[in-house]
Amino acid sequence: MEAFAIAKFQRHGSRKVGLVLDQIRGKNVKKAEEMLPFIEKRTAELVYKTVHSAAANLEVKSGKKLDLSKVYIKEAYANIGPMSNLRRIQPGPQGRAMPYKKSMCHLTVVVSDEKGGR
Protein backbone atom coordinates (compact mmCIF):
# COMPACT_ATOMS: atom_id res chain seq x y z
CA MET A 1 0.00 0.00 0.00
CA GLU A 2 1.22 3.49 -0.81
CA ALA A 3 0.51 6.97 0.51
CA PHE A 4 1.94 10.34 -0.37
CA ALA A 5 2.28 13.90 0.89
CA ILE A 6 2.79 17.01 -1.20
CA ALA A 7 4.14 20.32 0.11
CA LYS A 8 3.34 22.96 -2.48
CA PHE A 9 4.62 26.50 -2.95
CA GLN A 10 7.57 26.16 -0.58
CA ARG A 11 10.08 29.03 -0.54
CA HIS A 12 13.12 26.87 -1.23
CA GLY A 13 14.92 26.04 -4.44
CA SER A 14 14.18 22.63 -5.91
CA ARG A 15 17.89 21.81 -6.31
CA LYS A 16 18.57 22.56 -2.64
CA VAL A 17 15.65 20.41 -1.52
CA GLY A 18 16.89 17.68 -3.86
CA LEU A 19 20.20 17.50 -2.00
CA VAL A 20 18.37 16.49 1.18
CA LEU A 21 16.00 14.13 -0.66
CA ASP A 22 18.95 12.25 -2.17
CA GLN A 23 20.12 11.34 1.32
CA ILE A 24 16.81 9.80 2.46
CA ARG A 25 15.44 8.23 -0.73
CA GLY A 26 15.01 4.45 -0.34
CA LYS A 27 15.49 4.42 3.43
CA ASN A 28 12.85 3.47 5.96
CA VAL A 29 10.85 6.28 7.55
CA LYS A 30 12.19 5.73 11.06
CA LYS A 31 15.80 6.02 9.91
CA ALA A 32 15.00 9.06 7.76
CA GLU A 33 13.27 10.84 10.65
CA GLU A 34 16.30 10.15 12.84
CA MET A 35 18.71 11.46 10.19
CA LEU A 36 16.93 14.64 9.12
CA PRO A 37 17.43 16.75 12.30
CA PHE A 38 21.20 16.31 11.91
CA ILE A 39 21.39 17.39 8.26
CA GLU A 40 22.65 20.97 8.31
CA LYS A 41 20.40 22.40 5.60
CA ARG A 42 17.44 24.74 6.00
CA THR A 43 15.34 22.49 3.80
CA ALA A 44 15.75 19.48 6.12
CA GLU A 45 12.91 20.68 8.35
CA LEU A 46 10.55 20.92 5.37
CA VAL A 47 11.50 17.41 4.23
CA TYR A 48 11.04 16.07 7.78
CA LYS A 49 7.50 17.46 7.99
CA THR A 50 6.57 16.06 4.58
CA VAL A 51 7.97 12.58 5.34
CA HIS A 52 6.16 12.56 8.69
CA SER A 53 2.91 13.59 6.98
CA ALA A 54 3.24 10.88 4.33
CA ALA A 55 3.79 8.23 7.03
CA ALA A 56 0.74 9.48 8.93
CA ASN A 57 -1.30 9.37 5.71
CA LEU A 58 -0.29 5.72 5.25
CA GLU A 59 -1.43 4.89 8.79
CA VAL A 60 -4.80 6.52 8.17
CA LYS A 61 -5.15 4.78 4.82
CA SER A 62 -4.35 1.34 6.26
CA GLY A 63 -6.48 1.90 9.36
CA LYS A 64 -3.94 0.50 11.81
CA LYS A 65 -0.78 1.54 13.61
CA LEU A 66 2.30 0.78 11.50
CA ASP A 67 5.88 0.09 12.49
CA LEU A 68 7.82 2.94 10.85
CA SER A 69 10.91 0.77 10.44
CA LYS A 70 8.92 -1.29 7.91
CA VAL A 71 7.66 1.71 5.93
CA TYR A 72 9.99 2.83 3.14
CA ILE A 73 10.35 6.04 1.16
CA LYS A 74 9.54 4.87 -2.34
CA GLU A 75 9.79 8.20 -4.17
CA ALA A 76 10.94 11.64 -3.13
CA TYR A 77 11.32 14.52 -5.56
CA ALA A 78 11.05 18.29 -5.82
CA ASN A 79 9.62 20.09 -8.83
CA ILE A 80 10.06 23.74 -9.75
CA GLY A 81 7.18 25.94 -8.61
CA PRO A 82 5.93 29.17 -10.16
CA MET A 83 8.19 32.22 -10.24
CA SER A 84 5.80 34.76 -11.70
CA ASN A 85 4.82 36.38 -8.41
CA LEU A 86 8.25 36.40 -6.76
CA ARG A 87 10.13 38.56 -9.22
CA ARG A 88 11.77 41.56 -7.63
CA ILE A 89 13.76 44.48 -8.97
CA GLN A 90 16.88 45.91 -7.39
CA PRO A 91 18.25 49.29 -8.43
CA GLY A 92 21.32 48.96 -10.61
CA PRO A 93 24.01 51.35 -11.78
CA GLN A 94 23.18 54.35 -14.00
CA GLY A 95 19.44 54.14 -13.28
CA ARG A 96 19.02 50.59 -14.54
CA ALA A 97 16.85 47.94 -12.94
CA MET A 98 18.40 44.59 -12.08
CA PRO A 99 15.75 41.85 -11.75
CA TYR A 100 16.15 38.83 -9.50
CA LYS A 101 13.88 35.87 -8.91
CA LYS A 102 13.05 34.03 -5.73
CA SER A 103 12.41 30.37 -6.38
CA MET A 104 9.68 28.02 -5.17
CA CYS A 105 9.27 24.28 -5.28
CA HIS A 106 6.68 21.55 -4.89
CA LEU A 107 7.90 18.62 -2.77
CA THR A 108 6.40 15.12 -3.13
CA VAL A 109 7.15 12.13 -0.89
CA VAL A 110 5.65 8.68 -1.56
CA VAL A 111 5.92 6.01 1.15
CA SER A 112 5.10 2.32 0.92
CA ASP A 113 4.92 -0.57 3.34
CA GLU A 114 6.49 -2.88 0.75
CA LYS A 115 10.25 -2.94 0.28
CA GLY A 116 11.51 -2.16 -3.20
CA GLY A 117 10.11 0.27 -5.70
CA ARG A 118 12.27 2.55 -7.81
Curated annotation (Swiss-Prot):
Q: Name one Pfam family in it.
A: Ribosomal_L22
- State the Gene Ontology BP annotations: translation
Q: Does the keyword rRNA-binding apply?
A: yes
UniProt keywords (A-Z) are: Ribonucleoprotein, Ribosomal protein, RNA-binding, rRNA-binding
Gene Ontology cellular-component annotations: cytosolic large ribosomal subunit
Q: Which CDD domains match?
A: Ribosomal_L22
Look up the domain of life of the source: Bacteria
Give one GO term, molecular function aspect.
structural constituent of ribosome
Q: Does the keyword Ribonucleoprotein apply?
A: yes
Q: Which HAMAP family does the protein's record reference?
A: Ribosomal_uL22_B
Tell me its family: Belongs to the universal ribosomal protein uL22 family.
The record's function comment reads:
This protein binds specifically to 23S rRNA; its binding is stimulated by other ribosomal proteins, e.g. L4, L17, and L20. It is important during the early stages of 50S assembly. It makes multiple contacts with different domains of the 23S rRNA in the assembled 50S subunit and ribosome. The globular domain of the protein is located near the polypeptide exit tunnel on the outside of the subunit, while an extended beta-hairpin is found that lines the wall of the exit tunnel in the center of the 70S ribosome.
Query: Which NCBIfam families does the protein's record reference?
Result: rplV_bact
Question: Self-association or partners: how does it assemble?
Answer: Part of the 50S ribosomal subunit.
What this protein is called in its record is: Large ribosomal subunit protein uL22
The uppermost taxa in this organism's lineage are: Bacteria, Pseudomonadati, Elusimicrobiota, Elusimicrobia, Elusimicrobiales
